[in-house]
């Protein structure tokens, strides 16, 4: 059974490992590895930030991955996901996206969730579509062609 909880200070190194995993870096808009010092500052600021929700997903005792949702304007938030390498390809992504999106939108009914995904990231595109996101448009973000997907309250 897939469950989630809010990220805590004890998750800092787990997030550090996930964020620097090779495939995660290659699908990010900033592909350079992240230093531990930079990550620590970022992580501890984010878990305290009232505009950010960081969720750790588990399947029993196994940590599956994380989703981060950040409010960036009055009625807009962006969502991002990463899955532990050994749990990819097991249909966790769309379930995590759907659960986290519903959790956020149930508590923020006037918001739209926005996902910005590299054109080359076919698995993420499929997962977001399966979780109820629709293609809003395409753009070039930091020299990367990407798609903009949106989900609003159902």
Predicted regions and their residues:
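Conserved GNAT-fold acetyl-CoA-binding loop/helix
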Residues: 23-41
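A short helix-loop-beta-strand connector motif used in the catalytic cores of GNAT acetyltransferases and
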Residues: 44-56
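Residue-level marker of structural boundaries
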Residues: 21-24, 33, 48, 88
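Acyl-donor (CoA/ACP) binding surface of acyl/acetyltransferases
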Residues: 1-14, 18-19, 54-154
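Short amphipathic alpha-helical segments and helix-helix/interface helices
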Residues: 43-44, 125
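Hydrophobic alpha-helical core bundles mediating ligand binding, dimerization, or RNAP-core interactions
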Residues: 15-20, 39, 43
């Amino acid at each position: 059974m897939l469950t989630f909880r809010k990220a805590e200070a004890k998750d800092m190194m787990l997030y550090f490992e996930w964020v620097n995993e090779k495939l995660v870096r290659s699908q990010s808009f900033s592909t350079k590895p992240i230093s531990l010092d930079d990550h620590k500052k970022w992580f501890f600021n984010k878990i305290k930030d009232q505009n950010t929700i960081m969720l750790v997903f588990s399947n029993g005792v196994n940590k599956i991955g994380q989703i981060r949702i950040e409010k960036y304007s009055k009625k807009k938030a962006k969502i991002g996901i990463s899955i532990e390498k050994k749990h990819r390809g097991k249909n966790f992504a769309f379930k995590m996206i759907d659960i986290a999106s519903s959790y956020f939108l149930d508590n923020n009914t006037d918001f739209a969730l926005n996902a910005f995904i590299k054109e080359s990231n076919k698995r993420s595109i499929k997962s977001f579509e399966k979780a109820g996101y629709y293609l809003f448009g395409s753009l070039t973000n930091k020299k990367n062609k990407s798609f903009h997907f949106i989900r609003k309250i159902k």
